[in-house]
């Protein structure tokens, strides 16, 4: 099956894996000094955000089970993906709904709270077709990296296993770096990646981001 990009944030390939060593709500994440040398990434998990967050993705309801997919969606009919449980969802509050059999779906920008296991809505969903996402800052300043492509490929191959339990979504090499999309990061995973691979070799991007004040 082909894969469809489903958000303006350009989240690519993969699926969520939410279990294992995710930090419990309100707990302090372990520090990089607590992790084995070279194994910070995947040993550490960011604490859930205390404030509201925003994410863009596809909401899918299969027989009453509602999830939001912040990564890619298989271009089948109806679409398929593995996502994050979504609480407080009501289709009556949503525009742009499609359905096929017992499956309903739509693409939305969502505001809510994330507790490490589910997203709970705190605002009305906005269809992505009507949503103007804020520009994201490029942490590299547009400067290419210098890591050889062969090393980037090895790093990319490691990331799904290293980050699976901390919300890995996707990764790809570009401009001398590996770009990796995760469900949520407050800087913990970026610091861990810098510890393991060198500063700026791996760029971590969070699908959920703090809501505007």
Where are the regions that the model predicts?
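OB-fold and OB-like single-stranded nucleic-acid-recognition modules
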Residues: 2-14, 21-213
């Amino acid at each position: 099956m082909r894969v469809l990009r489903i958000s303006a944030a350009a989240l690519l390939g993969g699926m969520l894996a939410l279990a294992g060593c995710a930090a419990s709500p309100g707990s302090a994440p372990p520090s990089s000094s607590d992790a084995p040398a070279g194994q910070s990434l995947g040993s550490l998990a960011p604490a859930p955000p205390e404030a509201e967050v925003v994410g863009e993705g596809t909401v899918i309801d299969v027989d009453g089970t509602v999830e939001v997919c912040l990564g890619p969606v298989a271009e089948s009919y109806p679409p398929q993906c593995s996502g994050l449980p979504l609480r407080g969802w009501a289709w009556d509050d949503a525009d742009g709904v499609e359905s096929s059999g017992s499956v309903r779906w739509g693409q939305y920008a969502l505001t809510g709270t994330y507790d490490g296991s589910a997203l709970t809505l705190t605002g009305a969903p906005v269809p992505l077709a009507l949503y103007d996402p804020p520009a994201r800052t490029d942490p590299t300043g547009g400067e290419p990296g210098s890591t050889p492509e062969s090393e980037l490929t090895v790093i990319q191959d490691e990331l799904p296993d290293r980050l699976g339990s901390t919300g890995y979504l996707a990764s790809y090499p570009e401009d001398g770096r590996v770009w990796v999309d995760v469900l949520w990061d407050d800087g913990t995973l970026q610091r861990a990646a810098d510890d393991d691979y060198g500063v700026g070799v791996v760029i971590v991007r969070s699908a959920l981001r703090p809501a505007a004040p």
